[in-house]
Design a protein with these regions (language model features):
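A short, proline-enriched helix->beta-strand linker immediately N-terminal to the Walker B motif
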Residues: 11-15
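Catalytic Walker B motif of ABC-type/P-loop ATPase nucleotide-binding domains
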Residues: 17-20
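Helix N-cap at the start of a conserved alpha-helix in ABC-type nucleotide-binding domains
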Residues: 28-30
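H-loop/switch region of ABC-family ATPase nucleotide-binding domains
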Residues: 53-54
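A short, surface-exposed alpha-helical micro-motif characterized by mixed small hydrophobic
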Residues: 59-61
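ABC ATPase nucleotide-binding domains
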Residues: 90-134
Length: 134
């Protein structure tokens, strides 16, 4: 249903889509497909996408820039790497890091594992772990 609504908006010639929780209520595969569709619309058709989402695990895979808002104010903004490397800003507004970033952050700070950076995706985490043990 959500894809049909988006198609209708695009058929009317909209160049900007404002979406509130476009992945809400979808299973993980549906969330991934929706975010992939929105990314393709942006990259291939030049459609500007502005969305509100709490799906932080998908953000690093699909978004170039994001802003964390609280009470109408921007708390932090930038690339996913810029935003998610400040977990204190996330917890202050009751958001969490992407799951893999949360795990690596805990390993780095609580278990003193020498990660150079906090990876945001499973692929990035794999590369960082291989670097540590290569």
């Amino acid at each position: 249903k959500k894809r049909v609504c988006i198609a209708g908006l695009l058929a009317m010639g909209h160049e900007i889509l404002l979406l509130d929780e476009p992945t809400a209520g979808l299973d993980p595969m549906g969330e991934y497909k929706m975010m992939n569709l929105l990314t393709r619309l942006n990259k291939e058709n030049g459609v500007t996408i502005v969305m509100a989402t709490h799906s932080v695990d998908l953000v690093p895979l699909f978004l170039d820039r994001l802003y964390i808002l609280s009470k109408g104010q921007i708390v932090r903004g930038g690339t996913p790497e810029d935003v998610f490397t400040a977990p204190e800003d996330m917890s202050n507004v009751k958001l969490r890091l992407p799951q893999i970033a949360e795990l690596i952050y805990k390993l780095k700070h609580e278990d003193k594992m020498p990660f150079e950076r906090i990876p945001l995706t499973i692929g990035e985490a794999r590369r960082e772990i291989v670097k540590l043990y290569a």
